[in-house]
Structure formats: structure tokens, C-alpha cells
């Protein structure tokens, strides 16, 4: 099939006709011919050429590649796999865990879903840049002023075209700034984002075989045009091309390339350095990873890294940080997402499959027979593995995050009371970490279930001003209230906070890492002593009291206490070591953490906005009874992969959130009546659940958030905002300096009270009504002012006084050809009428211009028309269109300097490292202490 020849002949036919309809017919015929000969499919090698022809001439061309749909076989309708099943999704809620003691569970079926669209990091080096101004050949016309002598064609010249502005419509003229913004966003989406060249399309210079030509950046078209040596017009250009060359410096990794570019393209190439993907050296991060993994692993690079190997930067969006401060819901969603990420990292497999053996041993020691159905057998009923694991995860997460805990589960039995007594020692009880209500409830539970009955005191009931049982009873001595019990109560009432393990380096992004302020080696640490004191005091009091247990027989109660003392006092230290083991290792990747900030220090009101997590009351006792082995050793490969994932996630979240915020902000700056909120909600493409959650913020709240001055300032500091604004400036400047009348848009118009003869704006036309500069001394009116009713009376006054004036601003033009003027049609009538019939009655009623006026544009470039006196008489116009001159492609090339190297950008570091395990047989802390000793 000879498709290229078909396209070539269609190109020539399109150039030979003037009207847009004829051109469209030719291209439609071409497409139908090709599809008819090729089973309805357009081959790829021809498709790009047709698209280019259509784009240059402003023609419409839509083609979708056919997709083959094949169904191999029908699924089995009886199969379990093909039946409809519920998909249970994780929900964003303030409650993180399911209550393990509840008898019935809830399954959440989502009533709405949010579609996530991952951010594609598309690496585009400089040579992928597609020039916006293409080149074409035009021929000068030498007009004749005698009827018997026809016009002649003169020398050829190569010009830049302006097809990049062939998509402005009447609606976009009214809102020209938005059109410029859309154009800038469109350019930014395809603008190179790597500030170097990775390859060049080169060819031997035919005019100087010692040099090389670069065919990228649309230069191939230029060299094709001047290659015709029979065309003497380009002799000078061919001599200049002898000096075109590509010089590559392999040591400095630079390339010097000779190019001829439109100033607009040159400006966009300068903007590329602001649009680059933010990156950092790969070698530095690899060295950091190797140091982190040095605990039990040896990480060696798989291959040597080049000096230009880069890694996407670990960027933390300032816009997201400010949004978290403004919206507690967004902050909680982000914290919850981070917490979910962390849960899989902790090493908590320290329990055997069941605690029943430990419970049986305790029951046997207490001589409790299972045939007796009394409250004794339910004393430890709520102790189980699920509670232990859940509580352990909460404890570990508390070291990285700050949240509120809510004790749940049965709070009226012996096991819950013992567990609460341990919680008061291990958990942080200071006001900043635990609310007063939770603290009081735990203290009251311990007092009422364990202490009051044993020491023969009345149970405590909350009253106004006296809510804590320990405060009420700590100073009342005598009776069976021994010093040991009082010592425990005093210790708890100190409300000791956890110790700081590592201070935050940025309190807007991460919180301090905290650990229990309990020694992991010294058995005489006051926390262990406090628990010991409590049990010693209780055992002593129970021996003197004939009925010490509230619901349990006296002998069983005393024996239960003794066995509890052994279990609890001995198992708290392994728990503290286990926490230290986890925290000190995860803290090594502190620099790569996800968002864990606690904003209470910055905004005190956020104290009530923390996530609330349910903790089983019996959890601490479950841990104490269940912990019976060492955890797994840390796998640094997974931990460092986690760091890679978080880096990529931060990058994607920043990209997807900031780009939409910038567009919404600029649209609102252009027209403050436009809603930023609606634009964001309709157009956001969330990369993660966190970004998607912004659309769930209530409407009025979201409006308030978006009006925050600090948030808007952060948006204005983003890379995306800077790039879009620079491209907008370049597009505006390009519009002012390229000819656009041929695409139906002019820069302005000079309106006259009486017709004048046509003039000739350039050597490429016989005559037209284009002016490059408005005459000096003529009043100018801005279209924007007139649309808003400013200075409209002044314009009417000029018309009444028969004075010429200029309307400056993008105006739509109505193209008229020469035959329409000849035949005295409406085009002739409007062009020769005063002011081009500019003033409409509707405008006078509104006292402003309601619709931007459409002015007539006439251009005659046909040399076949004779220069008759009749034509001279008719060719007058009262409107002159203001446009820019055509830009000639420079003869001598400009030398551009680019970095020249391979694309070595990566998102993952662990793939470049090889991990060799050299772990010791025992799991130890960094100070060499065993985590679990039998």
C-alpha cells in the first residue's frame, strides 16, 4: 500500500486551496481512502503525519485505534470464584481496632468508593521537547501596478508559523487569561522534566561532511526545505548551515548543539530547569541505607553507581502540612494511614498460640475446680492472645504517635483489675498523654476490684471534686491498708510520662519517639518495685481479712494473688525489652518516616482531635501471661523497602495535591467569583486515600480552609505554581508577537469613521487590512475595560465626533476573501461602513460591550487576479486589524549548551543493594542484652 504518497499528494492539495472547508474535505477524503484500503485501520507510520497536517492547518481529526475484544470461554456460573462477594474495605474512622471481646462483629460495606489514580513519573529529557512554532516556506509577491502586466512571485523565505494559537474561540476571548492558563497547563504536561539530553537524532552535515546536524527540535523540517539546491533563494542559508555542528564533551558530559528556534520555544527551553523532577544523589542514600542495615546484615551495592545516578527526592509537601493544621479530619486520615503502614513492621510474634496453658496453671495453683460455676472461673476469662497482640501494637504505636486510649471490655473482674494495675505503671499517665477521665477510671477499677475489698474499705464512688479513688484514699492509713499498697498508689499518682528516646527534627512532620521510663535491666527499678509493692501489700492484707475477695472465695483469691505476683512481676521486664528492641531499630529510619506529627504543641486545640484507640483492659495481663519467646530478628530489607515506599508515596501525594491546588488558586486569582472548592472536588486525581479524603471535608469547612492566607502562600511557593506562571508569561508574550489573524484572532483593531484603501502589511500578500502598530495619537480602549463597562461612554463619544480609535485586546476576526469584496456582498458593506458596524443597540442599552465585536479581516495573496480599476475602487475598509509580523527563521544558528547523559533516575534504593544476613543466634538489644531470657 502506497500510503505515504497518498499523504504527500493530500499535503500538496491542502496547500493549493485557501478555504478551511476545502482543506477539511481533502483530509476527510484521505482518511476514508486509507481506512478503506486497510480494513478500517490507519497505520502508525502514517497516523503521526496526518495528525501533524491537521494540527498545522487547524483542522479536526479524531481517530481511535480499534480494540479487539475476545472472550475465551464463559465462566462457570456455579463456581464460588465467579459469584458476587462483598469486598470489605478498610474504613477511615477514629476507632482503629475492633473490640476483641464483643460477641458480634460489624462488617462495613462501603456505600461509596473513591478511585485512586497513581502518579506516573514520566521521565522526559530535553530532546523530547516538541517545538510549538513549526517552519514553512513562503514566497514573496512582486505586485504590478499596470493592468496588462500580472503580479510575479519573488524570492522564497522560511517563516515560523503560529498554529499553536489556532484553538481560541469566541468564548475564550471573553476569558482570555483562563485560556492562557489552560494553554500553560497543557504545555507543562508535555514539557521535559529532566534538564539534560539523553540522545540526539544526528546526521552528517551535507554542506560540510566534517560536521553533524541535529534533527531534533523540529530542525529536520528546516534542513529538508533548504536541501533543494535548485532554489537560489536559500543560497545564503545553505552557506550558514556549513557551520552547524553538534559537539559532545564526554568528560564534562555537555553537548553544544546548533539550533534555529522561535523565541517562544527558546523561552520554554529556559523554563525546563524549573520544571525538573526533584531528585537527590543516589550514592548518598545508598551509603545511608548500608549504615542502617549494619545491624545483623551486610548490604553491598549490586553494581557501581554513576556520578549522575539520581533518586527521587524525599519531599514533604508544605501545602499538606498546612492542610493538616487546618483540618483535623485530614490530619487524622494521614496519621491513620501512617499507622496502618507501621503495623506490619513491628516484631510482635512473642506469644504462643494460646494462653490457656498459663491460665490452667494459675487455676490449678488456686485449687479451683472447673465444676464449680462461680465467679472465680471467670476471673481471667477476658485474657486471650487477641487482647495481648492488640495492646502490644498500641504500646508500640504510642512510642511514635500521640493518640488517646479508651479502655474497653469487661471492667468488673479480677483479671481486668490486675491488668489495669499494670497499665497504670507501663502506659504514660501524664496529662499530655492520657486524659484525666481515662486515668481516673483505671485507678477506680484497681481500687474497687482489688484494693477496697481486700483492705476492708468501702468501694469508691465518683463525686464532684473527688473523682479518683487513689487521691481519696492514699493518705488515709490504718486498718489493713498497708504501706506497700499506699506506696503503689503514690507512685501511680505521680502520673509519670514516658522518656524521650529521640527528639523530633521537624515537629510539623514527625513527633518525638518516646519509650517507657523503665529500666530494662535493673529489677530494683521503681516501676517494678511499685507492682511488687502492690501485690505484697494485697497478699498481706488478704491474710488478715477473712473475706478478702469481692466475688471469689477467700483461699482461691489469696492463691490467685500469689500466682499473679510471680507472672506479672517477672514478665514486665521482657515487655519493656521487647518495646526497646522494636523502637530502637525502627528509630534508625527516623529520617524516612511517614507523617506522624502531633500538632498539640503548635495548636493546643488539637488535643481533642487526636485519634482515639480502643485498648482491651485485660490486654496488659494477657501480655504478661502470654509472652514466652523471643521475637523474630529484624529484616532490614523490608524496613528499607518501607522507607522507599514512603518516599514514593510522599512524592505522589505532593504531585497530585499541589498541581490541582495551583490550578484552582490561579483560576480564582483570574476571576474571584470562581469557586476553588468545586474545581478541586471535580478535577482532583488523588494518588492515595489521604489525598482523596480532602473531597470528604464538609463544604463550608473546605471553603474556610481554602481561604487561609498561609495555605495560599504555601501554594504560591510550590514548584508547580512557579512553572505555570512562567509558562503563562511566555504564552502571553508569544500571543503578542506571532501573527494570529489567520487563525481568527487579532490583537486589536483600528476603527475608522470612513473607509480607506487597503494596505500591504508584508511582501507575502498583495493587500490586506493588517497593521503592525496602531497610529500614534489615536485613543486606545482595552477590550477588558469595555466588557466591564469602563470608558464605554468615551468610546461612544469618539464615534459621535467621527474620530478613529483602537480597541486593544484579543478580538475575533471574520475572514473575507477577494471574491466576496468584488461581488459587493455583506463583507464589502460592513468593511466599507463606518466603524465596521461596531456599535450595537444592545451595547448602548447595557452601557458596555456585551459580546466582543467580530471585525473583518481581508487578505489577498493570489497573483492571478488582475489589478483592475474596479478593484481599486471597491477595496476600501473602515477597519484595520492589528496583528504581529511574521517571523523569519534566522539564517545563522544559535548554539545551545545542554548536559548530555543517560537517564539514571530511580524510585527505589533497596533494589540496588544486596543483603547478606550475618545475624547472631540470639535476639538482643543494641547494648547486647537478651530481649527474652528463660
Curated annotation (Swiss-Prot):
Q: What is its main location?
A: virion
Any one GO CC term of this protein is:
viral nucleocapsid
The name of this protein is: Inner capsid protein VP2
Q: What does this protein do?
A: Inner capsid protein that self-assembles to form an icosahedral capsid with a T=2 symmetry, which consists of 120 copies of VP2, with channels at each of its five-fold vertices. This capsid constitutes the innermost concentric layer of the viral mature particle. It encapsidates the polymerase VP1, the capping enzyme VP3 and the genomic dsRNA, thereby defining the core.
Relate the assembly described in the record. Answer: Homodecamer; each decamer is made up of two conformers of VP2, called VP2A and VP2B. Interacts with a VP1-VP3 complex. Interacts with the intermediate capsid protein VP6. Interacts with NSP5. Interacts (via N-terminus) with NSP2.
Family to which this protein belongs: Belongs to the rotavirus VP2 family.
Superkingdom of source: Viruses
Q: Any stretches that span the bilayer, and where are they?
A: none
Amino acid at each position: 500500500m502506497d500510503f505515504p504518497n497518498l499523504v504527500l499528494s493530500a499535503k500538496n492539495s491542502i496547500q493549493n486551496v485557501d478555504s478551511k472547508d476545502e482543506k477539511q474535505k481533502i483530509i476527510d477524503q484521505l482518511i476514508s481512502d486509507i481506512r478503506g484500503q486497510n480494513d478500517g485501520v490507519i497505520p502508525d507510520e502514517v497516523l503521526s503525519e496526518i495528525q501533524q497536517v491537521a494540527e498545522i492547518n487547524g483542522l479536526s481529526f479524531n481517530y481511535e485505534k480499534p480494540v479487539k475484544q475476545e472472550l475465551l470461554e464463559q465462566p462457570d456460573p456455579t463456581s464460588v470464584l465467579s459469584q458476587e462477594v462483598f469486598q470489605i474495605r478498610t474504613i477511615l474512622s477514629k476507632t482503629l481496632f475492633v473490640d476483641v471481646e464483643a460477641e458480634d462483629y460489624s462488617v462495613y460495606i462501603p456505600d461509596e468508593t473513591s478511585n485512586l489514580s497513581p502518579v506516573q513519573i514520566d521521565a522526559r529529557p530535553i530532546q523530547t521537547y516538541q517545538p510549538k512554532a513549526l517552519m514553512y516556506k513562503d514566497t514573496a509577491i512582486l505586485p504590478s501596478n499596470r493592468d496588462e502586466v500580472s503580479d510575479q512571485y519573488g524570492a522564497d523565505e522560511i517563516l515560523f508559523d503560529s498554529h499553536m494559537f489556532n484553538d481560541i474561540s469566541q468564548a475564550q476571548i471573553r476569558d482570555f487569561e483562563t485560556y492562557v492558563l489552560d494553554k500553560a497547563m497543557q504545555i507543562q504536561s508535555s514539557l521535559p522534566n529532566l534538564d539534560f539530553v539523553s540522545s540526539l537524532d544526528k546526521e552528517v552535515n551535507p554542506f560540510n561532511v566534517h560536521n553533524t546536524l541535529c534533527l531534533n527540535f523540529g530542525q529536520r523540517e528546516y534542513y529538508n526545505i533548504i536541501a533543494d539546491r535548485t532554489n537560489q533563494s536559500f543560497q545564503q542559508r545553505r552557506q550558514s548551515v556549513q557551520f552547524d555542528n553538534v559537539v559532545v564533551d564526554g568528560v564534562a558530559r555537555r553537548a553544544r548543539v546548533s539550533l534555529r528556534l522561535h523565541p517562544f520555544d527558546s523561552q520554554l527551553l529556559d523554563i525546563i530547569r524549573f520544571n525538573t523532577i526533584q531528585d537527590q544523589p543516589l550514592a548518598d542514600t545508598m551509603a545511608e541505607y548500608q549504615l542502617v542495615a549494619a545491624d545483623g546484615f551486610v548490604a553491598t551495592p549490586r553494581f557501581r553507581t554513576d556520578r549522575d545516578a539520581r533518586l527521587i527526592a524525599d519531599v514533604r509537601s508544605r501545602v499538606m502540612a498546612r492542610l493538616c493544621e487546618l483540618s483535623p479530619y485530614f490530619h487524622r486520615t494521614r496519621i491513620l494511614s501512617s499507622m496502618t503502614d507501621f503495623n506490619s513492621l513491628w516484631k510482635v510474634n512473642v506469644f504462643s498460640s494460646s494462653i490457656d496453658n498459663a491460665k490452667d496453671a494459675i487455676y490449678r495453683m488456686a485449687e479451683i475446680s472447673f465444676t464449680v460455676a462461680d465467679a472465680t472461673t471467670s476471673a481471667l476469662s477476658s485474657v486471650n492472645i487477641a487482647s495481648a497482640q492488640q495492646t502490644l501494637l498500641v504500646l508500640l504505636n504510642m512510642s511514635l504517635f500521640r493518640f488517646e486510649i479508651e479502655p474497653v471490655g469487661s471492667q468488673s473482674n479480677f483479671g481486668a483489675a490486675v491488668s489495669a494495675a499494670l497499665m497504670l505503671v507501663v502506659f504514660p499517665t501524664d496529662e499530655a498523654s492520657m486524659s484525666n477521665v481515662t486515668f481516673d477510671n483505671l485507678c477506680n477499677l484497681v481500687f474497687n476490684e482489688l484494693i477496697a475489698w481486700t483492705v476492708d474499705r468501702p468501694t469508691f464512688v465518683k463525686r464532684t471534686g473527688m473523682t479518683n479513688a487513689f487521691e481519696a484514699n492514699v493518705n488515709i492509713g490504718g486498718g489493713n491498708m498497708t504501706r506497700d499498697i499506699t506506696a503503689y498508689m503514690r507512685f501511680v499518682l505521680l502520673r509519670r510520662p514516658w522518656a524521650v528516646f529521640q527528639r523530633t527534627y521537624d515537629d510539623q512532620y514527625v513527633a518525638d519517639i518516646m519509650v517507657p521510663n523503665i529500666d530494662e535491666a535493673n529489677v530494683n527499678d521503681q516501676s517494678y518495685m511499685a507492682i511488687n509493692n502492690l501485690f505484697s501489700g494485697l497478699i498481706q492484707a488478704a491474710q488478715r481479712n477473712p473475706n478478702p475477695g469481692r466475688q471469689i472465695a477467700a483461699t482461691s483469691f489469696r492463691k490467685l494473688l500469689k500466682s499473679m505476683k510471680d507472672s506479672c512481676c517477672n514478665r514486665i521486664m521482657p515487655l519493656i525489652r521487647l518495646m526497646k528492641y522494636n523502637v530502637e531499630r525502627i528509630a534508625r529510619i527516623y529520617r524516612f518516616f511517614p507523617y506522624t506529627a502531633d500538632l498539640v504543641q503548635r495548636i493546643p486545640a488539637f488535643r481533642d482531635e487526636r485519634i482515639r484507640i480502643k485498648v482491651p483492659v485485660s490486654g496488659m495481663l494477657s501480655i504478661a501471661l502470654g509472652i514466652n519467646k523471643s521475637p523474630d530478628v529484624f529484616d532490614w530489607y523490608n524496613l528499607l523497602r518501607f522507607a522507599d515506599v514512603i518516599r514514593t508515596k510522599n512524592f505522589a501525594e505532593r504531585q497530585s495535591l499541589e498541581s490541582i491546588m495551583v490550578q484552582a488558586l490561579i483560576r480564582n486569582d483570574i476571576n474571584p467569583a470562581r469557586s476553588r472548592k468545586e474545581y478541586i472536588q471535580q478535577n482532583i486525581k488523588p494518588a492515595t486515600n489521604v489525598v482523596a479524603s480532602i473531597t470528604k471535608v464538609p463544604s463550608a469547612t473546605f471553603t474556610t480552609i481554602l481561604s487561609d492566607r498561609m495555605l495560599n502562600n504555601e501554594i504560591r511557593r510550590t514548584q508547580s505554581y512557579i512553572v505555570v506562571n512562567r509558562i503563562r508569561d511566555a504564552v502571553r508574550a508569544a500571543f503578542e508577537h506571532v501573527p494570529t489573524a489567520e487563525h481568527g484572532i487579532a490583537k486589536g483593531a483600528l476603527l475608522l469613521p470612513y473607509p480607506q484603501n487597503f494596505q500591504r502589511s508584508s511582501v507575502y500578500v498583495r493587500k490586506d487590512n493588517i497593521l503592525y502598530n496602531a497610529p500614534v495619537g489615536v485613543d486606545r480602549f482595552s477590550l477588558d475595560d469595555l466588557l466591564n463597562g469602563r470608558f464605554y461612554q468615551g468610546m461612544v463619544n469618539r464615534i459621535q465626533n467621527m474620530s478613529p480609535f483602537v480597541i486593544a485586546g484579543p478580538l475575533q476576526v471574520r475572514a473575507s476573501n477577494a471574491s466576496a469584496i468584488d461581488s459587493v456582498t455583506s463583507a464589502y458593506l460592513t468593511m466599507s461602513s463606518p466603524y465596521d458596524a461596531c456599535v450595537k443597540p444592545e451595547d448602548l442599552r447595557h452601557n458596555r460591550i456585551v459580546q466582543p465585536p467580530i471585525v473583518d479581516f481581508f487578505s489577498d495573496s493570489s497573483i492571478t487576479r488582475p489589478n483592475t480599476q474596479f478593484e481599486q475602487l471597491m477595496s476600501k475598509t473602515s477597519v484595520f486589524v492589528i496583528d504581529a509580523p511574521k517571523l523569519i527563521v534566522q539564517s545563522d544558528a544559535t548554539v545551545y549548551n545542554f548536559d548530555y547523559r543517560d537517564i539514571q533516575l530511580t524510585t527505589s534504593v533497596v533494589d540496588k543493594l544486596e543483603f547478606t544476613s550475618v545475624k547472631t543466634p540470639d535476639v538482643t538489644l543494641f547494648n547486647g542484652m537478651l530481649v527474652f531470657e528463660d
